[in-house]
């Protein structure tokens, strides 16, 4: 549904969009009749309690208008159509059905000013909530309590909802990049990784801080400094025209010099927008090139099993000459509790 929201403005959860030479048709059922009239732009709205029958009928009408003797070509989003629906649509329906991967996702990579402003608003709400949680203290509280307060605080700060379930991982559990918050209490001398984000006007923020004790152990402090340097190196590489994998390379080179590369187990970053994970990917597998208007994360991390982890993440807007932060919490020094 994200692509339909991007193209039409519809924020509901069930609809089909048909694009043909005759025009754009938005098909949904009666549950969304009023919502679609309020939100949908640039499309004819069709309300039908037999949605897929209506879609089939309109596809057949459109294909009959093609020149005689020439089969119609019907493109569909292959990532978003189940095998069952594909069989339903193609059964007895003449034409060449063409699977198209990511036709809209490619358009969504470059953000307009209004989209960036929405993400900035989401980041402000998320960061404001985090600062309130930190001011109340973490020690002695459980990871679940901190995550719940953080997500509740985002809404009080003006967010529609969290953009994903917050990660709060303390002590040795912070070595799990996607740890689920547990009922474990946060110890006095433990580091805590907090990965969090909010949603405003449909758009997401994504940010990670590593909170360490006021007097951290030397190994934990070295880890933090290594990740901070790697992130700064990655951010300096972000600018229009640079291959995405080049940003990942810069981060890996920095961690390699610090001796932590083998503990970096994921890619450097990803695009953010209406979805929390979008193209492009800042990884060695990516063939994309950064372009003005993209918003990506730069989020190196070091994860040592049995000891703990550190991750630092910001959202960066790509411009011609540099990358500008969309998230605003400072990362040069650790957040100390």
Q: What residue spans do the PLM features occupy?
A:
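Active-site neighborhoods and metal-handling regions in enzymes and metal-associated proteins
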Residues: 1-337
């Amino acid at each position: 549904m994200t692509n339909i929201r991007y193209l039409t403005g519809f924020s509901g959860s069930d609809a089909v969009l048909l694009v043909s030479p005759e025009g754009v048709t938005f098909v949904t059922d009666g549950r969304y009749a009023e919502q679609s009239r309020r939100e949908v732009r640039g499309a004819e709205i069709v309300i039908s309690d037999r949605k897929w029958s209506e879609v089939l009928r309109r596809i057949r009408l459109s294909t009959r208008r093609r020149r005689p003797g020439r089969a119609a070509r019907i493109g569909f989003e292959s990532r978003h159509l189940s095998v069952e629906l594909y069989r339903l649509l193609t059964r007895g329906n003449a034409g060449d059905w063409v699977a198209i991967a990511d036709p809209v996702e490619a358009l969504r990579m470059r953000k307009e000013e209004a989209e960036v402003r929405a993400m900035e608003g989401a980041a402000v709400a998320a960061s404001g909530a985090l600062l309130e949680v930190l001011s109340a203290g973490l020690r002695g509280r459980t990871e679940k309590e901190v995550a719940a307060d953080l997500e509740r605080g985002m809404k009080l700060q003006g967010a529609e909802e969290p953009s994903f379930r917050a990660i709060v991982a303390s002590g040795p559990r912070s070595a799990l990049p996607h740890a689920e918050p547990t009922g474990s209490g946060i110890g006095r001398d433990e580091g805590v990784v907090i990965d969090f984000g909010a949603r405003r006007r449909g758009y997401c923020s994504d940010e990670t801080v590593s909170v360490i004790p006021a007097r951290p152990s030397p190994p934990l402090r070295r880890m933090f400094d290594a990740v901070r340097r790697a992130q700064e190196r990655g951010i300096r590489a972000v600018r229009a025209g640079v291959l995405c994998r080049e940003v990942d390379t810069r981060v890996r080179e920095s961690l390699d010099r610090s001796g932590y590369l083998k503990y970096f187990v994921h890619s450097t970053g990803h695009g953010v927008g209406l979805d929390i994970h979008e193209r492009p990917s800042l990884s060695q597998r990516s063939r994309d090139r950064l372009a003005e208007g993209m918003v990506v994360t730069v989020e190196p991390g070091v994860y040592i099993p049995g000891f703990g982890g550190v991750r630092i993440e910001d959202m960066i807007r790509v411009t011609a000459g540099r990358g500008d932060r969309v998230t605003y919490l400072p990362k040069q020094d650790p957040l100390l509790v």
